[in-house]
Regions:
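Beta-alpha junction/loop-to-helix N-cap segments that form part of ligand/metal-binding clefts
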Residues: 4, 89-96, 107-178, 246-254, ...
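Sec-dependent bacterial lipoprotein signal peptides
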Residues: 1-17
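Extracellular/periplasmic ligand-binding modules, especially the Venus flytrap/periplasmic-binding
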Residues: 216, 228, 275-280, 326-389
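Extracytoplasmic "Venus flytrap"
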Residues: 46, 58-73, 77-99, 121-124, ...
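Bacterial lipoprotein signal-peptidase II cleavage site
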Residues: 19-31
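Extracellular/periplasmic periplasmic-binding protein-like sensory domains
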Residues: 285-360, 431, 458, 462-466
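Solvent-exposed, acidic/polar segments of extracytosolic/periplasmic ligand-binding ectodomains
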Residues: 38-67, 393-469
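Extracytoplasmic ligand/sensor domains, especially the bilobed periplasmic-binding protein
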Residues: 139-245, 293-318
C-alpha cells in the first residue's frame, strides 16, 4: 500500500506546471528544509510587507456574506490528503504553510479586519466527496490546497457555489474548471517548454535517444503524454520519445527497466513518478554501470529528501522549478521571509515546495478580498472575490516565483534548472546575476510555453457556464 500511495502522490506534480507549476505541479515538489531561526524571523517577519509586495493583511471594517458560511471570521479550507493511512502526512506542507500565513495575517489584523479561521479538511486521498461536503458546509473558500483526485470535487463544488484559489491542480477536470483562479496556472493543454529549449541549445547531442519512464496510472500516463506532446511541438529534439510504463503500484525490481534503458542505448531520460521510486531506478542503473547522458525531470524532483536519500545515484539529475530556490534565500527576500514566517508562526511545520505554492495562493486570495471589499460595500462575497482574483494580470507572490498571469491562466515562460550534486541541489541555470538571468533570478524564454494537442482527461465535469472560467 505504501508504494501505491507514493504512486498516487506523484499525480500532483505540477503544480508549477507545475509548475507543472508551474510552472510545475508536484505532491513532493520542493526542497524540504528547516525554518529560519527565531532571531532571524524577528527582524522582518512582521514588517507590513511580504517580499516586494505590500502585505494584503491589516485592519478594516469588512463583513463576510452570512449566506456563505460567513460570521465573525473568514473561514478558509486548505484541503490535503494528509490522512491517507498508507502515506501519513501526504501534502501536509500545504496546510502547514496555510497555518503560518493565517498566524502572520491575523497578527496584522486579519484581512480587512476579519480574522482568518482554518477549516481543517482531509480527503485522505480516497474521501474527496466527503471532504467537499465539509467545505461546502463550513468554509467560505478553498485556498492553497490540492487533492490528488481533484476531479472528484465535482459536481458538489459548483452546487454549493464554492470558490478556490488552489495551491495546485492535478486532473484536466480541475485544471480547466470554472470557479477557481490559480496563482501559478497549470492548464492541461498549455505547458512550459523552457527546460526543453535549454536542452536543445546546450545538450543537443544527448537528445538522440529519448525515453520517458512513466507509471501506468491514468494521471502519470497523461503527464507522459503531455511531455511527449510538448517535445514534438518544440521540435528539433532528436528522435520521437518512447514511453515505457511501469506498475504505479510498485515493482518487485527495477532491474529489468534499467536493462531496457541500457539495451536501447537511451541518452535522455525523463521519469514520471514519485522520487522514491526513481531512486530505485537509479540504483538499478548503477548496478549495471549504465547512465543516460542527460536526465531531466519535473518540479517534483526538486526535493532535498530525494537528493539526500539517493546520494551519488542522483548526481546530475536536473529538475525544473518556477519558484525561488531554498538554497539561496539571501538572493530571494520573499523566500527568506517565508522561512521567517514559518519559524515564528508554525515552527514545527514542514517546509517544502508545495508550501510555497500554498503561501502564494493565500497572498492572492487576500489581495482579491481587498479588491472585492473596495467595490462591494465592505462585504466579502464569493463571486466578488473570484472576479477580483481573475482581474489580476501580474503575480509573483511577492517574489516567491516567476511572474504569472492568473487572469490569462497560462504558465510562465520563465524558470530555473536545479541539479543534484553530492546529496543536495545546486543551481544549474541561470546563474544568478549572469546575462542568462533576465528576470530577477530566472530565465525567460521567448517561446517558453506551447499549446499542446491531445486529450488528457474529461474537462466537462468541472464546467459551470454560469460562473465562467
Amino acid at each position: 500500500m505504501r508504494r501505491i500511495a507514493r504512486a498516487f502522490a506523484v499525480s500532483s506534480l505540477l503544480v508549477l506546471g507545475a509548475c507543472s507549476a508551474s510552472g510545475g505541479d508536484s505532491a513532493d515538489s520542493g526542497s524540504d528544509t528547516t525554518a529560519a531561526s527565531d532571531t532571524t524571523a524577528a527582524g522582518s517577519v512582521d514588517s507590513g510587507k511580504f517580499g516586494d509586495m505590500d502585505s494584503p493583511c491589516g485592519p478594516g471594517n469588512a463583513t463576510v456574506d452570512p449566506t456563505q458560511n460567513g460570521g465573525p471570521t473568514l473561514k478558509v479550507a486548505t484541503p490535503t490528503d494528509k490522512g491517507f493511512t498508507a502515506l501519513p502526512g501526504l501534502d501536509i506542507e500545504l496546510e502547514d504553510a496555510a497555518k503560518a500565513f493565517i498566524g502572520w495575517c491575523n497578527k496584522q489584523g486579519g484581512v480587512q479586519g476579519v480574522q482568518l479561521e482554518l477549516v481543517e479538511t482531509d480527503a485522505a486521498l480516497l474521501q474527496v466527496p466527503a471532504a467537499m461536503e465539509k467545505m461546502c458546509a463550513e468554509a467560505f473558500a478553498m485556498v492553497g490546497g490540492g487533492l490528488v483526485f481533484d476531479d472528484q470535487e465535482f459536481p458538489r463544488f459548483h452546487e454549493c457555489k464554492m470558490i478556490d484559489i488552489p495551491g495546485y491542480t492535478v486532473t484536466a477536470t480541475k485544471a480547466e474548471s470554472d470557479g477557481k483562479v490559480e496563482p501559478v496556472p497549470n492548464p492541461s493543454n498549455v505547458k512550459p517548454t523552457g527546460w526543453l529549449l535549454w536542452a536543445k541549445e546546450n545538450r543537443a547531442a544527448d537528445l538522440a535517444k529519448p525515453l520517458f519512464l512513466a507509471g501506468n496510472a491514468v494521471t502519470t500516463k497523461n503527464v507522459a503524454l503531455q511531455l511527449k506532446s510538448s517535445w514534438e511541438v518544440v521540435g528539433g529534439l532528436g528522435a520521437e520519445p518512447e514511453i515505457i510504463e511501469y506498475n504505479s503500484a510498485g515493482e518487485a525490481s527495477y532491474a529489468p527497466y534499467a536493462q531496457q534503458i541500457k539495451d536501447k542505448g537511451v541518452t535522455y531520460l525523463s521519469f514520471i513518478g514519485a522520487p522514491d521510486t526513481f531512486i530505485a531506478v537509479l540504483k538499478a542503473l548503477d548496478e549495471i554501470g549504465y547512465r543516460p547522458a542527460l536526465i531531466m525531470n519535473d518540479g517534483n524532483f526538486y526535493d532535498q529528501q530525494f537528493a539526500s536519500k539517493a546520494g551519488a545515484s542522483a548526481d546530475g539529475v536536473i529538475a525544473r522549478t518556477a519558484y525561488a530556490s531554498f538554497e539561496n534565500p539571501d538572493k530571494f527576500p520573499a523566500m527568506q521571509q517565508f522561512l521567517d514566517i514559518m519559524a515564528k508562526y508554525n515552527p514545527s511545520g514542514k517546509i517544502a515546495g508545495l508550501g510555497l505554492q500554498s503561501f502564494s495562493a493565500y497572498l492572492l486570495f487576500a489581495t482579491a478580498v481587498n479588491k472585492c471589499v473596495e467595490t462591494n460595500n465592505n462585504v466579502i462575497e464569493r463571486e466578488c472575490v473570484l472576479e477580483s482574483a481573475k482581474a489580476i494580470t501580474s503575480w509573483t507572490g511577492g517574489g516567491l516565483h516567476t511572474e504569472t498571469n492568473p487572469s490569462e491562466g497560462k504558465p510562465s515562460t520563465c524558470g530555473a534548472l536545479m541539479v543534484a550534486e553530492e546529496g543536495t541541489f545546486k543551481r544549474l541555470f541561470p546563474e544568478i546575476g549572469s546575462a542568462d538571468d533576465n528576470s530577477n533570478g530566472w530565465h525567460c524564454w521567448e517561446n517558453g510555453i506551447a499549446d499542446i494537442p491531445g486529450d488528457f482527461g474529461d474537462v466537462s465535469k468541472g464546467k459551470d457556464p454560469s460562473r465562467g472560467s
